[in-house]
């Protein structure tokens, strides 16, 4: 899900055997550059025999379709290898604005989605593994303080059905003072995110989309304040792995 700057380091996990064909689904929450910048450096794009299905919902497409955005990103003057010249097979899919009762099924997983309140549009994805009964919801960019009630209701439904999600990974970029000064920027305070997690019934909360202006000391202090309010919560860290049947591993 998404193609940030760390994506190239994920390639060995997505396709451990360089000689074998790989079939990978990439979901894009939206088309802002911080969620796309790692895609040109993904080694799988340059490996013949690889298939990448790249999908985004119509709620994110104020700038165009998935194919039009990728052709802009992968080509002159931004990148030396043109989209049409990629050795991999890249299939672009434009999803409906919301999944409703029709999840996308892939590799034993069920994927549902709903729109988020963010400039230009954004999408929250829910991933369920019916065989284990585990689930997560990822909502990277959202300004909940001024969200339309219907959008909040749809997101709540996404988090609760078919069962309350085990993990909510969500935007908690600001503190209370900063979020007030940056109304309209499309992000949420950590305290509002904690309230949201309780409202939607998420078992655990992991905050992401940290403010680039915040250093590690600031983030650690924020995590302590967050855990005083919601002990099951934490801040996401680079390289963190989470077993949905256990706690986070650092």
Residue spans of the language-model regions?
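Cap/insert and terminal regions of metallo-dependent hydrolase folds
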Residues: 135, 143-238
